[in-house]
C-alpha cells in the first residue's frame, strides 16, 4: 500500500506571492505554515512540493536561482520547524517561454506530470492524499492524478467560482487544514 501525502503548491500557499519570487530577501512564509507542515508530517504525511515556475522560461530568473532559493527554503523549514520536504518537483516550462524552456510539457499544472512522477518516485497513494493550492490549475492537476482531497486556500490568488466548485475544501490558509487531516 502506498504512502499518504500532502502535495503543496509554493507561491500563495507556502509563501506570500509577490510575483515570480526568486530571491531569499523576497521570500516570506505565510504565517503559521512551518508549524502546520510539522503537524502534517507528524501525522504521517509525506510533504511534496509541486510548483510551476514559468519565471524561468520567461527569463525573469535562472533555474540555478530557483534552486538556490528552494535549497534555502528547504533548509529554513528544517532548521526552524524540523520539517523535511520529501519531494520537490517543479516545472520550468512555459509555451511562450524562451529557449529550451519554451515547450508544451506534461509537467506544467493543470497537467499532472509532477504529481505522477512524485507518486511513482515516493510510492504515494493518491487516494489517501491531499493537494493544497491557491488556483484552479492546482486542483485540476491533482484531480487528474487521482488525489482524493483538493484544498483551495485564500492566501494566494483570488478564488474563482470555478475553483471553489472544484475544491473539496476552501480554507483561509494551509494552517486550517491540520484539523481536517488524521
Swiss-Prot record:
One GO process term, biological-process aspect:
carbohydrate metabolic process
Indicate the principal place this protein occupies in or around the cell. cytoplasm
At the top of the EC hierarchy, this enzyme's class is: hydrolase
GO MF annotations, alphabetized: D-glycero-beta-D-manno-heptose 1,7-bisphosphate 7-phosphatase activity; magnesium ion binding; zinc ion binding
The site annotation (Stabilizes the phosphoryl group) covers: 51, 109
Alphabetical keyword list = Carbohydrate metabolism, Cytoplasm, Hydrolase, Magnesium, Metal-binding, Zinc
UniProt-listed Enzyme Commission number(s):
3.1.3.82
Q: Give the residues annotated as active site.
A: 9, 11
Q: Does the UniProt entry include the keyword Nucleotidyltransferase? A: no
**Which subcellular locations apply to this protein?**
Cytoplasm
Q: Where is this site: Contributes to substrate recognition?
A: 108
Q: Which cofactor does it need?
A: Mg(2+); Zn(2+)
Biological pathway: Nucleotide-sugar biosynthesis; ADP-L-glycero-beta-D-manno-heptose biosynthesis; ADP-L-glycero-beta-D-manno-heptose from D-glycero-beta-D-manno-heptose 7-phosphate: step 2/4; Bacterial outer membrane biogenesis; LOS core biosynthesis
Instruction: Give residues annotated as binding substrate.
Output: 9-11, 17-20, 51-54, 108-109, 135
Quote the catalytic activity from the record.
Answer: D-glycero-beta-D-manno-heptose 1,7-bisphosphate + H2O = D-glycero-beta-D-manno-heptose 1-phosphate + phosphate
Q: Where, in this chain's numbering, is Zn(2+) bound?
A: 91, 93, 105, 107
- Which sites bind Mg(2+)? 9, 11, 134-135
GO annotations of cellular component type:
cytoplasm
Its quaternary structure?
Monomer.
Q: Per the similarity annotation, which family is this?
A: Belongs to the GmhB family.
Name of the molecule in the record = D-glycero-beta-D-manno-heptose-1,7-bisphosphate 7-phosphatase
Annotated gene: gmhB
Amino acid at each position: 500500500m502506498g504512502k499518504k501525502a500532502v502535495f503543496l503548491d509554493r507561491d500563495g500557499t507556502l509563501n506570500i506571492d509577490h510575483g515570480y519570487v526568486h530571491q531569499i530577501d523576497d521570500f516570506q512564509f505565510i504565517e503559521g505554515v512551518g508549524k502546520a507542515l510539522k503537524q502534517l508530517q507528524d501525522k504521517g504525511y509525506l510533504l511534496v512540493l509541486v510548483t510551476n515556475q514559468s519565471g524561468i522560461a520567461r527569463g525573469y530568473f535562472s533555474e540555478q536561482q530557483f534552486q538556490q532559493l528552494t535549497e534555502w527554503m528547504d533548509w529554513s523549514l528544517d532548521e526552524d520547524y524540523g520539517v523535511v520536504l520529501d519531494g520537490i518537483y517543479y516545472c520550468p516550462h512555459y509555451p511562450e517561454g524562451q529557449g529550451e524552456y519554451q515547450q508544451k510539457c506534461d509537467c506544467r499544472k493543470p497537467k499532472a506530470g509532477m504529481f505522477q512522477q512524485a507518486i511513482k518516485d515516493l510510492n504515494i497513494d493518491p487516494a489517501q492524499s491531499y493537494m493544497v493550492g491557491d488556483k484552479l490549475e492546482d486542483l485540476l492537476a491533482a484531480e487528474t492524478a487521482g488525489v482524493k482531497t483538493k484544498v483551495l486556500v485564500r492566501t494566494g490568488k483570488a478564488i474563482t467560482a470555478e475553483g471553489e466548485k472544484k475544491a473539496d475544501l476552501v480554507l483561509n490558509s494551509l494552517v486550517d487544514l491540520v484539523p481536517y487531516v488524521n
